[in-house]
UniProtKB/Swiss-Prot annotation:
Binding site for Mn(2+): D275, D298
One Pfam family of this chain: Iso_dh
Originating organism: Medicago sativa (Alfalfa)
GO BP annotation list: glyoxylate cycle; isocitrate metabolic process; NADP metabolic process; tricarboxylic acid cycle
Name of the protein described by the UniProt record: Isocitrate dehydrogenase [NADP], chloroplastic
Phylogenetic classification of the source organism: Eukaryota, Viridiplantae, Streptophyta, Embryophyta, Tracheophyta
InterPro entries (alphabetical): IsoCit/isopropylmalate_DH_CS, Isocitrate_DH_NADP, IsoPropMal-DH-like_dom
Cofactor: binding details: Binds 1 Mg(2+) or Mn(2+) ion per subunit.
């Protein structure tokens, strides 16, 4: 389902760089990347990013999948599955934000079905862990000013409350948890609670050793790559067996494959109680990876985003347990409100930084897999150009609002395209330096 016309020949003539012509030698990339296009305002931004910040400098073989809602509907969501399978094949995917349809969207687009979240589908196929990390600009005030370094949060995106079975209990009676083993073996029959009054509520949830182990491997790999310490948070003092299993598996994985590497890198792995960890996070300066169980990761990633200032400055990378397959995207949605203005021909000022960083993080991973130092250098220069532009006072409206508050006026910010043009100009300066 990808478009072959987006695959550029590896035998493209080399353009040598000269300051006189401002021509750039395009960086050759040996292996393909998977591109997943998206919806609404982020789809508009996505094209600007490719045309102004990526294609003029990098010669890419792109396996293109259109994950825009109309095409997902046309293919009965097969395109989403195919894009995830291609990611497993090529190891690097870069994804634009997409709509997860609700009833209103089914009506708006005339959909055949209320298709599932593309992120959920992709996550299940890749069996990955989602890592979110803020982009820090020195001049954008943070709600928690002590956070001078990023905190990268890894959320175990499987099981627990999100795959649980819950029930309302009507009246008195016994609640039991029963496990029936396959084949031989005795049934385990645990009495949970004896309801005597009007009843109440009950919940049964689970996780698997395989999934916890994958989560541990991905977390260890990310922390080592960043050369930051790793913390796992649980409540094993209360859930001695359930959370205790997370603690034990992480420790096993660490000692079996990572301890010597961590010691050589001067970093460490440590288990912490979730309440201690939240208190530590609040008073720390940042600079670590925080591995969270599913629910904790859901809550704490939003707490971090707000503390650092903005979801518009938050990257999201799905890391697979093989350590070499990733999918990079922005942590925010499709910016529908701005898209409605754009549809009417109005001016928008949409923050493209997290979408640009989806490209840089994806390409940086491709560079590491291919041992392509030139490509890695390009991604670092593009990230520095983004941050440099904001720190020089040129930014989109959302960031200007954090800076100027009620005194905000039009001269304080650039529109959507002007901001990307400013980043492109800064990038060219950095490349030709």
């Amino acid at each position: 389902q990808f478009s072959p016309n987006l695959s550029f020949s590896a035998f493209f003539p080399i353009i040598t760089f000269t300051t006189a012509t401002m021509g750039f030698q395009k960086i050759k990339v040996a292996n393909p990347i998977v591109e997943m296009d998206g919806d609404e305002m982020t789809r508009i931004i996505w094209k600007y990013i490719k045309d102004k910040l990526i294609f003029p400098f990098v010669e890419l073989d792109i396996k293109y999948f259109d994950l825009g809602l109309p095409y997902r509907d046309e293919t009965n969501d097969k395109v989403t599955v195919e894009s995830a399978e291609a990611t497993l094949k090529y190891n690097v995917a870069i994804k634009c934000a997409t709509i997860t349809p609700d009833e209103a969207r089914v009506k708006e687009f005339g959909l055949k079905s209320m298709w599932r979240s593309p992120n959920g589908t992709i996550r299940n196929i890749l069996n990955g862990t989602v890592f979110r990390e803020p982009i820090i600009c020195k001049n954008i005030p943070r709600l928690i000013p002590g956070w001078t370094k990023p905190i990268c949060i890894g959320r175990h995106a499987f099981g627990d409350q999100y795959r649980a079975t819950d029930s309302v209990i009507k009246g008195p009676g016994k609640l039991k948890l029963v496990f029936v083993p396959e084949g031989q073996g005795e049934t385990t029959d645990l009495e949970v609670y004896n309801f005597t009054g009007e009843g109440g509520v009950a919940l049964a949830m689970y996780n698997t050793d395989e999934s916890i182990r994958s989560f541990a491997e991905a977390s260890m790999a990310v922390a080592l790559e960043k050369k930051w310490p790793l913390y796992l948070s649980t409540k094993n003092t209360i859930l001695k067996k359930y959370d205790g299993r997370f603690k034990d598996i992480f420790q096993e994985v660490y000692e079996a494959g990572w301890k010597s590497k961590y010691e050589a890198a001067g970093i460490w792995y440590e288990h912490r109680l979730i309440d201690d960890m939240v208190a530590y996070a609040l008073k720390s300066e940042g600079g670590y990876v925080w591995a969270c169980k599913n629910y904790d990761g859901d809550v704490q990633s939003d707490f971090l985003a707000q503390g650092f200032g903005s979801l518009g400055l938050m990257t999201s990378v799905l890391v697979c347990p093989d350590g070499k397959t990733i999918e990079a995207e922005a942590a925010h949605g499709t910016v529908t409100r701005h898209f409605r203005v754009h549809q009417k021909g109005g001016e928008t000022s949409t923050n493209s930084i997290a979408s640009i960083f989806a490209w840089t993080r994806g390409l940086a991973h491709r560079a590491k897999l291919d041992d392509n130092a030139t490509l890695l250098d390009f991604t670092e220069k593009l990230e520095a150009a983004c941050i440099g532009v904001v720190e020089s006072g040129k930014m989109t409206k959302d960031l200007a609002l954090i800076l100027h508050g009620s005194k905000l006026s039009r001269e304080h910010y650039l529109n959507t395209e002007e901001f990307i043009d400013a980043v492109a100009a800064e990038l060219k300066t950095k490349i030709s330096a």
